[in-house]
């Protein structure tokens, strides 16, 4: 069986690292991902995908990324119950940051 996804999108907020009850570092992020096709009104819709980052992946993403930055998340889908899913990140690639747009 294979459970692997790759998502490219923009961070909707600055990542924040917290420590869980076991002392592990964790960060929950949401990526805004534009669909590759237009809807009936001619508009590209956006999906908001929840991802969970652990340990050094969480710390590095929080240190080097900010709201609006484009990143790639490689990981696996995890069911949270019902129809709610999240991506458990195994690798993050920083593709671009929003700082260049401000200058």
Where on the chain are the PLM-derived regions?
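Single-stranded nucleic acid-binding surfaces, predominantly the OB-fold ssDNA-binding core
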Residues: 1-103
